[in-house]
């Protein structure tokens, strides 16, 4: 068993005659938390090889060291398999950062971003451990030009500030095995919050609650492990950021930062104000809220430095909408208005758009005229059409996630569906999926509905489109960002031409198809139907939503 030698012969002070660490399989959930850990009182950090490090334990007792090393290997087999293996680059740097959250309520969103990044990182090590109002992040990095350019740093900016630990960057070739033990103990054994390790994008094993309890019982009682959270190279981030353990009645976790992080501060205000305006002015797309005069009159909202906060608030509002059914959206829009009252037939103040809407009465009349024309004046066909549309939009039927209309030009397809897109707001448009467009589906993530106008795709994407039309989760490439996960999102397809998925058997249960005819009478209408017309239409034909 190795008592502190480097995994590469780079240090002249290595100690001989030690065994190779054994590997262990077995997995536990990364979400399990360590409820009992070593005493977390902050003490003065010790010099290298001093008290509280695995190197010091190796000096004191080889038997104790071997036992502890074996236990650590069992608790983090993937972690140690990578850092002591041949695939890790000696020239890479070990980076340790701390995310100071601006608001504790942003913690889960920030953790989701870190998990998604960890899954998408196809090389190297990435891990994090959460401690309430801050999150520790570690990873190996090429450290080009002596700087880390990993994209997760910019992705977490809306949630807090990324701070360095204050220690000089250390390269992989400088690490001894005992150093890696100390890293694992500090970040993944002693931490109480959410923890995760990713090796080449695959989730690695972390200590379970039982393992942490056993570690505490076996080693804390014997005082084999110091209560210090720090070693020479991994100084406690809490000390670096001046966290005090003094009890504070005004702090939920009893910690005080010398440089106070925002608590319901600027970002919380911006998010609250932006979402309030988005409820007052129903704009499409959501980001168009920046053009509303009331938004532009607010100096804080208009500050270019707060652009990321505004985008994060808009994304958050979009997620609220994405989880809503048609009925919930209707309730949201009718809290302050009675849209069936003749005096409220034209509530323009709610809907802000680049196009001008007709009033609800005229809008309803023209939409009914269009549907009667396309359904041969058959009310049963109109009811069937609207019922199928609601089933797709509300994701009611498993594997049925696409609604298609094929017609000649000027049939009223966009005229009808612009009303729905204006209502749902959070919609994305799919592009032409060919070898020249690698990001055709980049607008698919975090949307309430998707529009695919005049679809065209290569056969290699057939399986992805099957998942899309069947409501299965899938991943898409996004320009200048990591790959994004897409949950079930309804797809509206409008086309003038026949495309392969319209007649392939594999898609028959995934798509509802209708054929429309050219509607020349629509050229006499200059205004678009008001979005709220859709709800009046459903009520007229007794469609449940």
Curated annotation (Swiss-Prot):
Q: How is the cofactor bound?
A: The endonuclease active site can probably bind other divalent cations.
So where does a divalent metal cation get bound? 130, 134, 136
Query: What's its top-level EC category?
Result: hydrolase
**Main subcellular localisation:** host cell
Q: Which GO MF terms are attached to this record?
A: ATP binding; ATP hydrolysis activity; DNA binding; endonuclease activity; helicase activity; metal ion binding
Polar residues biased stretches: 26-40
> Where does it sit, as one GO cellular component term?
host cell nucleus
Ranges where the SF3 helicase domain occurs:
346-545
Gene Ontology BP, a term = DNA replication
Q: Subcellular location, in the record's words?
A: Host nucleus
Residue limits of the PV NS1-Nuc domain? 12-277
Highest rank taxon of the organism: Viruses
Motif RCR-2: list the residue ranges.
134-136
Q: Which UniProt keywords apply?
A: ATP-binding, Covalent protein-DNA linkage, DNA replication, DNA-binding, Endonuclease, Helicase, Host nucleus, Hydrolase, Magnesium, Metal-binding, Nuclease, Nucleotide-binding, Transcription, Transcription regulation, Viral DNA replication, Viral genome packaging, Viral release from host cell
Role noted for this protein: Multifunctional protein which displays endonuclease and helicase activities required for initiating and directing viral DNA replication. Also plays a role in viral packaging and transactivation of several promoters. Binds site-specifically to 2-3 approximate tandem copies within the origins of replication (Ori), unwinds this hairpin region and nicks one DNA strand thereby initiating the rolling circle replication (RCR).
Q: What is known of its domains?
A: In the N-terminus, the endonuclease region is involved in binding to the origin of replication. In the middle, there are the ATPase and helicase activities. The C-terminus probably contains a transactivation domain.
Q: What is this protein called?
A: Initiator protein NS1
Source organism: Junonia coenia densovirus (isolate pBRJ/1990) (JcDNV)
């Amino acid at each position: 068993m190795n008592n502190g030698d480097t995994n590469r012969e780079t240090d002249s002070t290595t100690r001989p005659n030690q065994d190779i660490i054994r590997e262990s399989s077995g997995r536990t959930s990364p979400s399990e938390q360590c409820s009992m850990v070593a005493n977390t009182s902050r003490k003065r950090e010790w010099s290298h090889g001093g008290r509280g490090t695995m190197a010091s334990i190796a000096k004191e007792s080889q038997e104790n060291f071997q036992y502890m090393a074996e236990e650590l290997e069992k608790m983090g087999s993937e972690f140690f398999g990578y850092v002591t293996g041949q695939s890790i680059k000696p020239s890479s740097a070990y980076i340790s950062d701390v995310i100071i959250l601006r608001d504790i309520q942003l913690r889960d969103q920030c953790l989701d971003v870190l998990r998604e990044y960890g899954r998408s990182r196809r090389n190297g090590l990435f891990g994090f451990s959460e401690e309430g109002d801050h999150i520790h992040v570690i990873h190996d990095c090429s450290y080009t030009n002596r700087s880390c350019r990993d994209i997760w740093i910019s992705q977490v900016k809306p949630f807090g500030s990324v701070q360095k630990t204050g220690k000089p960057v250390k390269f992989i070739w400088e690490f001894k095995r005992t150093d890696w033990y100390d890293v694992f103990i500090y970040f993944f054994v002693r931490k109480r919050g959410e923890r995760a390790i990713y090796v080449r994008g695959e989730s690695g094993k972390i200590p379970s609650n039982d393992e942490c309890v056993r570690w505490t019982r076996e080693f804390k009682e014997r005082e084999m492990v110091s209560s210090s959270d720090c070693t020479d190279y991994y100084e406690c981030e809490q000390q670096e950021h001046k966290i005090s353990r003094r009890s504070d009645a005004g702090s939920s976790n009893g910690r005080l930062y010398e440089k106070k992080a925002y608590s319901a501060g600027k970002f919380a205000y911006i998010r609250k104000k932006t979402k309030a305006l988005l409820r007052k002015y129903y704009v499409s797309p959501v980001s168009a809220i920046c053009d509303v005069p009331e938004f532009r009159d607010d100096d804080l909202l208009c500050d270019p430095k707060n652009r990321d906060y505004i985008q994060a608030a808009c994304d958050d509002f979009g997620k609220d909408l994405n989880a809503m059914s048609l009925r919930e959206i209707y309730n949201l829009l009718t809290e302050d208005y009675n849209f069936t009252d003749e005096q409220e037939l034209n509530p323009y103040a709610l809907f802000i758009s680049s196009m001008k809407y007709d009033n609800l009465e005229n809008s309803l009349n023209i939409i009914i005229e269009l549907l009667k024309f396309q359904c041969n004046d058959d009310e049963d066909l109109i009811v069937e059409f609207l019922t199928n549309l609601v089933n797709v939009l509300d994701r009611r039927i498993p594997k049925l996630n696409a609604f298609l209309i094929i017609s000649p030009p000027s049939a009223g397809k966009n005229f009808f569906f612009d009303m729905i897109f204006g209502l749902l707001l959070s919609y994305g448009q799919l592009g032409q999926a060919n070898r020249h467009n690698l990001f055709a589906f980049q607008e698919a993530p975090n949307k309430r509905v998707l529009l695919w106008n005049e679809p065209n795709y290569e056969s290699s994407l057939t399986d992805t489109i099957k998942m899309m039309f069947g409501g299965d989760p899938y991943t898409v490439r996004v320009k200048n960002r990591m790959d994004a996960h897409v949950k079930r999102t309804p797809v509206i397809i409008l086309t003038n031409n026949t495309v392969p998925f319209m007649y392939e058997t594999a898609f028959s249960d995934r798509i509802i198809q209708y054929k429309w005819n050219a509607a020349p009478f629509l050229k006499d209408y200059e205004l678009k139907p008001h979005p709220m017309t859709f709800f009046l239409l459903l009520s007229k034909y007794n469609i449940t939503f």
